[in-house]
Regions:
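Short acidic, hydrophobic short linear motifs in intrinsically disordered regions
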Residues: 37-49
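Dynamic helix-loop-helix/coil hinge segments at AAA+ ATPase domain boundaries and subdomain interfaces
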Residues: 121-149
Length: 159
């Protein structure tokens, strides 16, 4: 529909691992599974794959390096923008494969449930009243039976 909706701000991006409010082991496993499956070797690539800011991913990479799951490979080439490259160690590959046996999920880092709930509340349309004129304007480009808008209005308003 072409209706204008109120602007709802997204929750702020986390600035640290602690702000993620997720277990470190889970975040670590999602990172190494994503590196393993997507062949992501640069922090900027990892950031894009797991959908977290670069500084948070770097913090996670540093944690994995301390656990000897990831090692630095140096700068890859001129195309990497002199960004440090990383790869899984043998121990990291084994951990990634073991983690994949437990759960095939990799990619975007999950959002903590309480943050998700708060965002859903902010996006709720329960207190938004939609008039027949607004609905007609939004659906004006469609050819619909006149009675349909009367039935559709309450359904749209109910969310």
């Amino acid at each position: 529909m072409n209706m204008q909706t109120s602007t709802v701000m997204a929750p702020p991006a986390p600035k640290t691992l602690a702000q993620m409010q997720l277990p470190l082991a889970m975040m670590r496993d999602i990172l190494i599974k994503s590196m393993f499956r997507m062949n992501a070797n640069l922090v900027t690539e990892m950031s894009r794959v797991i959908c977290l800011p670069v500084n948070v991913v770097q913090e996670l990479v540093d944690l994995c390096r301390q656990q000897r799951l990831i090692e630095a490979t140096g700068t890859l080439n001129a195309n990497s923008g002199n960004e440090m490259g990383y790869q899984l160690t043998d121990q990291g590959k084994a951990r990634a494969q073991d983690a994949l046996k437990q759960s095939e999920y990799f990619g975007a880092m999950p959002v903590p449930l309480d943050i998700y709930r708060e965002q859903i509340k902010r996006q709720s349309i329960r207190n938004i009243a939609i008039t027949r004129d607004q609905l007609s304007n939004a659906m004006g480009h469609l050819i619909l039976p006149p009675a349909l808008l009367g039935n559709l209005g309450p359904a749209v308003g109910a969310g």
